[in-house]
Design a protein with these regions (language model features):
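Generic beta-sheet signal
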Residues: 10-12, 27, 139, 160
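Proline-centered loop/turn at the N-terminus of a beta-strand
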Residues: 6-8, 49, 133-135
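Short, structured coil segments at secondary-structure junctions
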Residues: 4-6, 20, 74, 132, ...
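Flexible loop/hinge segments that line or gate small-molecule binding clefts
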Residues: 3-25
């Protein structure tokens, strides 16, 4: 629809990759900016036996396929791959909990989304599992999902994202304070909110340079443009309309807040097609290796 009407879409959430539209600017993480780094961290920290669980639609299928590839590269094993409805309730996770008990994986990789996320984490807690030994690791469990669960259910689990509400940089703190000042002190500030924020700035700057709201002119100005976002300086890759981002991994503490456990301080060039699906290839932008 966007292309047929010569429009322009900004997409602020992570996604499964393998897509391109010249009429879309992708500001969320591509798989080589979150999945790859998360796989490396989990394999080196917890072990190589994974159980995959996701919501029943395209993103989890593709995300789990990529994670399985990375795990196999790390000489790991996929013990099971299970899917639940998009609006899954406690009963939908009974089989998942049963399989976890039977297989005892080192890591549970979750691509469960939305309100079902808290149901999974609460079921995990009720089963008495120990996140210090067998965490749930995710790309889709953000501050927004954590806000819907008890802190005790969140504690110890892992998420990879380019931005966390607790990011310590001055720019991040200023952004979070402004966000909560507008939407309330309890409003969660996930990576998608940060991406939505900086993409508006990129769009308005491109619009000003173009001097017109014609999408073609704005697109021309957007490609290769940069902005000092809360996560770090981001850039639109002119090759694929995706964004150079700063990967991070965090663990949830007893208060249900993310605490960074891995931050290489490098900006990663987007590779939405995962041309090189290797645990050793980060596509690092060597010009930007400043810790944020």
């Amino acid at each position: 629809m966007v292309e047929s009407h010569r429009g322009l879409l900004f997409y602020p959430t992570l996604y499964e990759g393998f897509e391109y539209s010249r009429h879309c600017i992708y500001t969320g993480a591509a798989p080589n900016q979150n999945s790859l780094q998360l796989a490396r961290y989990l394999l080196s920290t917890y072990g190589n036996r994974f159980l995959l669980v996701g919501s029943n639609y395209i993103y989890p299928y593709e995300s789990n396929r990529l994670m399985a590839d990375f795990v196999m590269q790390g000489r790991g094993e996929i013990l099971d791959e299970l899917y639940v409805p998009l609006e899954a309730g406690p009963g939908d996770f009974e089989k998942v909990i049963g399989r976890i008990k039977k297989t005892s994986p080192d890591v549970i990789f979750s691509t469960v989304v939305g309100r079902s996320t808290s149901v999974l984490y609460e079921a995990y807690r009720s089963a008495g599992f120990d996140p210090a030994k067998m965490p749930i690791a995710s790309l889709t469990t953000s501050e927004a999902e954590v806000a819907q669960m008890h802190p005790e259910a969140a504690e110890g689990h892992i998420t990879a994202a380019p931005f966390f509400e607790t990011s310590p940089s001055r720019a991040a703190r200023r952004f979070v304070e402004s966000f909560k000042g507008k939407y309330g002190p309890d409003a969660p500030v996930p990576a998608a909110a940060e991406a939505a924020y900086f993409q508006v700035h990129l769009a308005m700057r491109a619009l000003a340079r173009s001097g017109s709201d014609d999408p073609e002119g704005v697109l021309k100005e957007l490609r290769d443009s940069e902005f000092d976002a809360p996560q770090g300086r981001v850039r639109i890759d002119p090759e694929n309309n995706h964004t150079y981002l700063w990967p991070r991994i965090a663990r949830l503490d007893k208060s249900g807040r993310f605490q960074t456990v891995w931050n290489p301080g490098v900006r990663i060039k987007p590779d939405p097609y995962c041309v090189v699906q290797s645990l050793d290839d980060w596509s690092v932008d060597d010009l930007h290796t400043v810790s944020h």
